[in-house]
Amino acid sequence: MATYPKLRCAAGNVLAAGLTTAGTIIVRPVADRTITVVGGWMRALGGTVATAASVNVSDTSNTNEVMVGTAANMTAGLILRENSTGMTCTKLNTALTKGDGLRIKGIGATVTAATSVDYCVYYLVEGG
């Protein structure tokens, strides 16, 4: 029986103040390892995401935008699943840059109106 890769999940809540253009790291980088995101969802809480154009999950080098939740579609309590209306996922099932982790961030500006965003990202870690 193979031991790797194992499916992992990064899940949590980030306050709007943490959804800046720099973002918040949700999976720490690990040298010589490659992350492949295979699914996930996001949900705004406390209001609709405003000011930022979108809330994105990307690699920590900011070269691959994995999940992009359009602000207008991130209304309070609505879960945006991968590739649903308002969520674009062009890098699902694609190995990201070796040694990178994952971050969640606001694009263009810090998120306002919504108080926070819940997230759940399913991913594989390979290499070593």
Model feature map: region roles:
Residues 1-128:
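Surface-exposed, low-hydrophobicity beta-strand/loop segments enriched in small/polar/acidic residues
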